[in-house]
């Protein structure tokens, strides 16, 4: 398990765009399971939507991507690199995510070759799928 400080040592994201709170399971270069505790204090709830707050779907996808980035960048040979989002396919949003929900984020890599990766992401709340799809990324050496 990784806490927020350990996550921030691996990926460059920071408030208000760091969208994972902890990593529950990690197999470097293969898979990761993360968690986001969704609170009404999230900045995006000010406008999405004030009378009916739901987490924007694109931010659920970003949280999945950040979880995948932790798995990819945990490999010793990838330390110091950045994982850029390269694409998404077949993303589906099944249920809304509300303040008070605990978002479980699981990413498993299907392929990773020469700095390009592809994987499957599934986000759940209380065991029910809220979002799923394929994620692609490219590793980049920071300048």
UniProtKB/Swiss-Prot annotation:
Keywords: Cytoplasm, Lipid A biosynthesis, Lipid biosynthesis, Lipid metabolism, Lyase. It is found in: Cytoplasm. Coiled coil: none annotated. This is 3-hydroxyacyl-[acyl-carrier-protein] dehydratase FabZ. Belongs to the thioester dehydratase family. FabZ subfamily. The active site is at 48. Involved in unsaturated fatty acids biosynthesis. Catalyzes the dehydration of short chain beta-hydroxyacyl-ACPs and long chain saturated and unsaturated beta-hydroxyacyl-ACPs. Its EC number is 4.2.1.59. SUPFAM superfamilies: Thioesterase/thiol ester dehydrase-isomerase (SSF54637). The lineage of its organism: Bacteria, Bacillati, Chloroflexota, Chloroflexia, Chloroflexales. GO terms for biological process: fatty acid biosynthetic process; lipid A biosynthetic process. One of its GO terms (cellular component) is cytoplasm. GO terms for molecular function: (3R)-hydroxyacyl-[acyl-carrier-protein] dehydratase activity. It catalyses: a (3R)-hydroxyacyl-[ACP] = a (2E)-enoyl-[ACP] + H2O. It comes from the Bacteria. It is an enzyme of class 4 (lyase). It comes from Roseiflexus castenholzii (strain DSM 13941 / HLO8). The gene is fabZ.
């Amino acid at each position: 398990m990784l806490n927020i400080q350990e996550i921030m040592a691996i990926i460059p994201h920071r408030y208000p765009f760091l969208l994972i709170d902890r990593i529950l399971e990690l197999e470097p270069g293969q898979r990761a399971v993360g968690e986001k505790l969704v609170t009404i204090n999230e900045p995006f709830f000010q406008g999405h939507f004030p009378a009916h707050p739901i987490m924007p779907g694109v931010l659920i996808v970003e949280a999945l991507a950040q979880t995948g980035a932790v798995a990819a960048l945990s490999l010793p040979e990838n330390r110091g690199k950045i994982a850029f989002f390269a694409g998404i396919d077949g993303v589906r949003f099944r249920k809304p995510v509300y303040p008070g929900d605990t978002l479980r984020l699981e990413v498993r890599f299907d392929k990773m070759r020469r700095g390009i990766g592809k994987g499957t992401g599934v986000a759940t709340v209380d065991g029910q799928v809220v979002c799923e799809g394929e994620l692609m990324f490219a590793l980049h050496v920071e300048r």
